[in-house]
Structure formats: C-alpha cells, structure tokens
Amino acid sequence: MNIVKALIPFVLCGAFAMAAKPPAPHLVVLKDNERLVANTLPTEQQIQDVIRLRGWRGERVSAQVVAWSAVLLCKWGGRLSCSALQAENTETVLQPQCLPVHETMAHGKPVADIVGSPCWRRDVFPGRNMPMAFMVQLDIPADAAPGVYRGTLRLGAAYASGKSYRGVTPSVEVPIELVVEQGVLPPPAEWKFHLDLWQHPQSVARWHKVKPWSPEHFDAMRPYMTMLAQAGQKVITCTLLDEAWNGQTHDDFPSNIEWIKGADGTWRYDFSAFDAWVSFMMNDIGITEQISCYTMVPWHMKVRYLDEATGKYEYIKLDVNSPVWEQTWGPFLTAFRAHLLQKGWLHKTCIALDERPDHMTRAAMAMVHKYAPELRIVSAVNKPTSLTREVYDLSPIITHADTVPEDLLTERKAQGKKTTIYVCLHPQKPNTFTFSPPAEAEWLGLFVAANGLDGFLRWAYNSWNENPLQCTDFGKWPSGDCFLVYPGARSSIRFERLRDGIEDAEKIRILRERAVALGTPEARAAIDKLNAELRAIFTVARSKGNSHGEDVARARELISETTENLFRL
C-alpha cells in the first residue's frame, strides 16, 4: 500500500550498547473514554488493537493512540505515518492526520489534553516507558463514497550510540478501519444546534502581546474563532459595560462600548470596538445568528463611564428600584437601538443576563420593551421560574433541565424561542473540565438531542489563566473551567469530544426529519425506537452517575442502526 507521508518526527534520548538490537516500540489504541495518564503506561483494560471509526460523510472522526519505547533512544526520532484509507470498488482516498496530545497540569496532576501541532514539542520519548498520546483525526469529505475503508498506522523509532547513527528499530503497525455511512452532515454553519461558548478577546490580546482591537489583534483571533465556528457556534459574545461578571477571569473583560457623559450632562456612546468585533465575527468568521450583549444587570451593579467635565472615569450605582435605573438605561437603549438599526443588526441582538433574580430580570425586560422592543432577552438561570415563557433564549443548568416540561418546550419551539442547557463549575459531572472523562463532553450534546432541547451554553471558550500550556488551574474554579481551547489555536480532547456530541445531535435531528419526510410505518417505527431509547438513557438522574462512556457508545450504535434503517427505505 502506498504510504502517504503524514509524518511526525520524534526526537528520542539515550543510547544503546553497540551490539544491542533494539526492540520494536509500542503502539496501542486507547478506548473511547480513556485518557493517557502522563508517565504511566496504559493498562490492558484501557486499550484495544484496532482503530475502529464510523461516521457520516461530512463528519469528523478520531481516535487516540499511545506510543512508547521500552529502551532509551536518542538522536533522530521515529516516524508515525498514516497510510491513506481506501475502500474496495472506489477510487476515493481518505487521509487522516496525526496530532500529538500533550499534557498540562490540573490540580497538581499531569493530564494529556492539549491537541497540538506536530512540531510543537520535541521530547516525544523523554525516557524509557514514558508514553506519548496522539490523535488520529479525519474530516470525512461530504462526497466520499459510503463503504468500509482500511489503512495502517505505522510507528518506527531510530536509535543511536554516541554520535553515530546505528539503524532503526523494527516498526509496529495498527490497523485502521473506517465505516463511512450513507448520511451526510452539512457544514457547521448550517447546523441547527444552538452553540453558545462565550468568547474573551482580551485573553488573546494578552497572550499574543498585541493592542486590543488592532489589526494584529484580529489576525491573532482569527484561528481561534475559526475553530469555534467550525464547531457550529451561533453567538457573538459582547459586553455593554466593564467587568459584567465582577472580574472573575485572569484577563480584564472591558466593555465593547465606551460610555461618555458630556460636560452638559448628556450621554453619548462610542460603538467603534463593538462594531469592529461584530463585523469581524460576522464577515471574517461567519458567525452571524445572534449577538448576545452582557449585560443590563451586572454582578457588581454599576456602570463605568468617562466624565468629560472632570476627565476622569466614574461609576453609576445601579438599583432597579431607583430613578437612576431608567435614567441610565433609557438613553443607552435609545442610542443602541438606533445604532443597531443603522448597522442592520437590530433583529440579531439580545440583551443577555447571567443568573440574575427575577425582579432584576423583569426590570431589564421592562426597559427593553419601552426603549428597544425589538431586542430579545437571553438568560442563563440556575432553575427556570415563571419567567421561562417570556425569555427568548433560556438556558437552565443541566441539573434543572427536567423542570422545563415537554409541553412548554413544544410551545417555545413553536414561538421560535431557544431552550438550551449549561454547565459551569457545577455539576461535577457531566462536564468539560481538564480532568473530566472525555465521554462526558460528548454526552452533553446527546442529552440536548434526546430531550428536545436546542443547544448548549458554556461561560468560557478562551478565558485563559496565566499559562494554560503549563497548568489549567485558576482561582476557585475546577481546573479547565475557564477555557476549552489553548493558546496557539490548539484544540483539546474535551473540545473535540464536545464537538462530537454536537455532530451526534445534528445527526439525530436529520434522522428525525428524514423519518417525517418518508412518512412510512417503517420510518416511524425506526425513529420512535431511537427516541425512546435516547430518552431512557440521557436523563438528569443518569447524568450524575458514571455511565457516560457506555451511554455514548450505545447512542452511537443507535444512531448507526437508525441511519441504516432509514437510508435503505
């Protein structure tokens, strides 16, 4: 078989005796819900012998492998090469890529989570029996022919004695089997799953040492936001005022809008940063559905503004029961509405609230209704209340998702409203922390689909600590709570698995739509079976257990079975 050189160089350390013949290195496949524990060899219970992948056309599939050497090697490294995958009776050739998975620290323990570029690190085999993980990943082309594709992952490792090159170890191979199914997943921009991961532009500016909102800043942000768009992101995160969350992140979270009080007491607003950010996300990145603006009810209940009379920054103390409330928000909303109308963004923009009590939420809604009625309300809440019916985009925490009854979900869908779930530092599981079992992230998307919800919200896509490449801890949060991707536009195991869950949800949606379009008893029976089993598995009660890996495996089986049944009708 022609081996395509998708090669990753390894640099290996140590030396053999001159006459020693080195043994072959080791290459194994991690099971789906396993992580490599740094400096620890995987156990028999964690591994399998074959990379088995299955997916629709247009879907991303992946597996983790682990490589190590039982002897200390040095100088030029080994090569991990993946052959092209080919199927019988087709000329289609599919080429996976191999990406190293590097460790970072989480609560004092090394965790392999960072999906890096091949040239990022050089100490692949830093010592005897010190393993390194890789992700074998493939975006199946939308026009690929369905069928079974096979190929090989091969690892060899060079060795040296002193300064002399002495030869290579025997190579070791792992078979790859990919089943490409009949279904076709559309591009992420066309997915219906309502993904809302909050962006943090200032983190990118600080890491890359560029001036906020400069051309260099937007250049630096482009790969991160492109990666987010490729996961199906629908929402642009904006800020109406400084530190809406009262400074809970390592980097500042300033307002996208400058508030200015003139010497004559009138208000004006500088929307230049807001305009640049939204235009970039829409026009350059392609995230166009919703603009969520935080917030009218900040955690600190104050608004920072520039007082032209003194040349100093001052603060307004907000109180929903005080005349200051309307005196502050009336002029702003009037100006904001006019500006959004001019830009063509009025009907995409929402006023966003984060875990605010009902009386504050109602006060914000009253101001919006009076001064900018076209704006809609987004609200992340711990537990739904009587306001549930009124909020356009509602996101309860997953542990209270079952308090939104099915008839209310149906009503909200009919009105074009969104109902999503979120996780944050709670619950402990399922979640997307650095140390979370990988299947938990995928489980979240399946929970959304199984329960007729619209999507998923999480408070931080990239609110990095000082150096997440070294450690993902920050403050009082569980490690990794503040971000899902890493500097250098590096993905993570947890982000990739979250994306897998979104793809699962999209496949379920498409299967449901296909069953309705077919309209046959066989199609109805197939989709009813899928829905019933998913609803039985993906419950709030079950979310608190330890079965996320087996739940995801069963859901994948069900999706494949239903795909086969519906696409042969």
Tell where the protein language model's regions lie, with residue ranges:
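Surface-exposed binding patches on compact interaction domains or structured appendages
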Residues: K21-I47, R60, A67-V136
